[in-house]
From Swiss-Prot:
Bias type Low complexity, positions: 220-251, 270-281
Organism, as annotated: Dictyostelium discoideum
Polar residues bias locations: 254-269, 301-321, 386-395
Known glycosylation sites: N102, N217, N234, N369, N407, N505, N524, N566, N622
Biased composition regions of type Basic and acidic residues, renumbered to the chain: 192-203, 352-364
InterPro entries referenced in this protein's UniProt entry, alphabetically: Dict_spore_N, Fol_N
Entry keyword Cell membrane: no
Subcellular location per the Swiss-Prot or TrEMBL entry: Secreted
Compositional bias (Acidic residues): 330-339, 374-384
Name of the protein this chain belongs to: Follistatin-like domain-containing protein DDB_G0289517
Length: 712
């Protein structure tokens, strides 16, 4: 007996270690390990604005975040209406930190966090999905990561106020009270399999419904006959009769068809007994459900109390799934035994035939299956019977009950954590697809400030790619401008100084270079001086894929490779414009120029600007003389009003002498604008090379004003 007890303890200890070893903490896995465990973990690429990009291993199966998303986009009917894959981007913000998740799943948020969808344009030109509202909020972070829409947007879609609490709508409990009781007792603290009920259980729904009433009646019947049945069982065990298997355990095992386990409870009030029994029964049933090995009988006939220390949260998912699949037949057999005396007699006859076989042979020859528990062993002594009934299932909280997800998404529980998942791709018309990011080089991990609640993450961090440098070959200056490239500053354009001719000392004019326009005698000595213009790009032929630049300060004309906007990595605060000669060039983004009489260009000698809810260009009449019936009808800028000398026309003659910018001289660095209230001087502040006009307007370079917005 002692040897058997020692063997049992060793096997149980090994089982405990094996169950613990199968626990996987996705948050602590590296990239390769996270990919290998994709049935439990999901590798998500996370982009931050002012930090390095990194990979995060989320504790949720990849099939919830990848397969379902791919299946939706594989539908040809939806594919025609669905936006690009970037519509699955979530922007998570807390205080000054912003992260982008390019997945349909996001971690659970705390009260200080918010998630939103970025828009490239303002709400006037953007559209949000149902359950979201658009808010104009402009953000252009200086330390933004390239091509990260969460760091650079004009507006955002945020959850609207009419968000209702989501009670995990995707969860579907197994049909039938029997299957539900089995699930509740085998998985008291783990709701992650509720969303995928077993298909075999659904096939047996009709049988479960058929026995639903029998379970309730039998539970009441068994509670009344507990004392008598227990005495019969004890008598059978002590006598060791050949028909010992005929007397079945009177405990109703509608939720537990495994090998009976020793109970150790005290007879107390029913409410207190249920609470204590629920906790202990949960731990014992977990051990049986999660065990990949058969449960050995208790050979020493003593209750084993050391198993209660096992944490119920560390059970194996596969074992509980197998147990749920294989229990229905056994449950139906146990229920049939209690339906009537006729069924009991039939069961006893079958058991009598089986009991004739020697127990030792059966014990040594038949090896129990991993997914099946061995038959009842009469050597186990049940000291007291539990008062718990199948209808009293353990109470466990659903994380989705406290979670709030916006319309268009639903709550998903995995690993005792709540996630908000999109039901279908949202209808975003403003999102632009992101280019595929190349695999960056690995660098030593820096400390990142993560803002997730109860998260301990080991991040596989990667360095961001080097940002492109601005040069005079990637920006465009006008023909009369020169590009200045100083150390520590971005290149800029300024007015080109007058060209200086190039002189050559030659012995005669015939030796002057081609293109020389002047040949004069040398006043200092013999020979001549040949004068020619500096060499320019018109005299240089570049090879294919290059272009020539000759307006770089202190740099001779040179060929540079063309810039392709679709393949280039655009610097922050810049956008790329295609060009036939240069291939493309960068233009700096700045705030939209506010339209006013100061920034609006009104072309024409008699044009002037009127501030009337917005600048408007109007034109004065060409005539400076108007005929009016009386002097009070003359314009405000009338200098004189005289009677009409023409006898044919009655009235007065209004002589107009308008003050205009033609007679106004503004201070230095200022320019004059004709308005309806007279000429005004404004400070020169606009440069078309680094400014943008609003839509339907173009920035026109002007020598006096520097630049102004002209309506298209």
């Amino acid at each position: 007996m002692k040897i058997q007890t020692i063997i049992q303890i060793v096997l149980i200890s090994f089982l405990f270690l094996n169950v613990e070893s199968k626990k996987i903490n996705c948050l602590h896995l590296q990239q390769d390990e996270c990919i290998k465990n994709k049935d439990k973990c999901f590798l998500s690429n996370v982009n931050s604005c002012c930090e390095k990009d990194f990979l995060m291993c989320l504790p949720i199966s990849s099939k919830y975040c990848e397969s379902q998303t791919d299946d939706v986009f594989s539908n040809k009917n939806i594919l025609k209406k669905s936006p690009p894959s970037s519509s699955h981007e979530w922007c998570l913000k807390k205080k000054k930190s912003i992260l982008r998740f390019n997945t349909s799943c996001v971690p659970e948020l705390d009260l200080d966090s918010e998630y939103f969808k970025p828009n490239l344009y303002k709400c006037k030109y953007s559209k949000c999905q149902k359950g979201f509202k658009c808010v104009d909020e402009k953000l252009h972070k200086k330390c933004e990561t390239e091509n990260n829409p969460c760091c650079k947007y004009e507006s955002k879609c945020v959850p609207s106020k009419d968000i209702d609490q989501n009670e995990a709508p995707i969860f579907k409990n197994p049909k039938g009270q029997l299957a539900q009781d089995i699930y509740n007792h085998l998985n008291p603290d783990s709701p992650q399999f509720k969303d995928k009920p077993n298909h075999e259980n659904h096939k047996k729904d009709k049988n479960n419904k058929k026995h639903k009433k029998d379970i309730k009646n039998n539970s009441d019947k068994n509670n009344n006959n507990n004392n008598n049945n227990n005495n019969k069982k004890n008598k059978t065990i002590n006598n060791n009769e050949p028909n010992q298997n005929q007397q079945s355990n009177p405990i109703d095992r509608t939720f537990n068809n495994e090998t009976p386990f020793p109970w150790n409870f005290k007879n107390q009030d029913q409410q207190q007994q249920k609470q204590e029994q629920t906790q202990k029964q949960t731990q014992k049933e977990y051990f049986k459900a999660g065990s990949p090995y058969p449960v050995l009988p208790n050979l020493n006939k003593e209750p084993t109390t050391h198993l209660n220390t096992i944490e119920p949260t560390s059970f194996t998912a596969s074992a509980s799934r197998y147990q749920l699949e294989g229990n229905d037949n056994k449950d139906e057999e146990n229920i049939d035994e209690n339906n009537g005396e006729d069924k009991k007699k039939k069961k006893k006859k079958k058991k009598d035939d089986k009991s004739k076989k020697p127990k030792d042979d059966e014990k040594h020859t038949k090896k129990p299956n991993v997914t099946e528990q061995p038959a009842d062993d009469p050597s186990i002594e049940i000291t007291e019977e539990p008062t718990i009934t199948p209808s009293s299932s353990p109470v466990h909280q659903d994380p989705c009950k406290k979670a709030t997800c916006p319309n268009g998404s639903h709550c998903l529980v995995y690993g005792n954590q709540a996630y908000c998942k999109l039901d279908k791709p949202p209808n975003y018309q403003t999102m632009s697809p992101l280019p595929q990011k190349q695999q960056p080089s690995v660098k030593k991990m820096d400390s990142l400030s993560m803002f997730y609640k109860k998260s301990k993450m080991l991040l596989s961090e990667y360095t961001t790619e080097q940002r492109p440098q601005l040069t005079c070959s990637t920006i465009k200056c006008e023909d009369d401008e020169v590009c200045i490239n100083k150390v520590g500053l971005n290149p800029y354009c300024q007015i080109k100084p007058p060209p200086k001719p190039v002189s050559y000392n030659k012995t005669s004019c015939s030796q002057c270079p081609i293109g020389s326009y002047r040949c004069n005698p040398n006043p200092n000595g013999s020979g001549v001086i040949c004068e020619t213009d500096a060499i320019n790009c018109r005299l240089i032929a570049c090879k294919e894929g290059e272009f020539c630049i000759d307006n770089i300060e202190n740099t001779p004309p040179k060929c540079y490779p063309k810039l392709l906007c679709n393949l280039s990595k655009i610097p922050p605060d810049y956008y790329c414009i295609s060009d036939e000669i240069r291939g493309g060039f960068y233009v700096k983004y700045e705030s939209y120029i506010d339209l006013s009489c100061e920034t609006l260009l009104c072309e024409g000698v008699n044009s002037y600007c009127v501030e009337n809810g917005g600048p408007i260009c109007k034109t004065w009449p060409n005539d400076t003389i108007q005929y009016q019936p009386s002097c009070d009808k003359c314009p405000k800028d009338t200098m004189s009003c005289t009677p009409n000398e023409n006898s044919n026309n009655k009235g007065v003659v209004c002589r107009i002498d308008r003050p205009s910018c033609s007679v106004i001289q503004c201070p230095d660095n200022q320019y004059c604008v004709n308005t309806d209230k007279g000429p005004k001087c404004y400070k020169r502040s606009i440069e078309c090379s680094n400014s943008r006009c609003p839509r339907d307007y173009t920035c026109k370079r002007d020598e006096i004003r520097g630049g102004a917005c002209l309506k298209n």
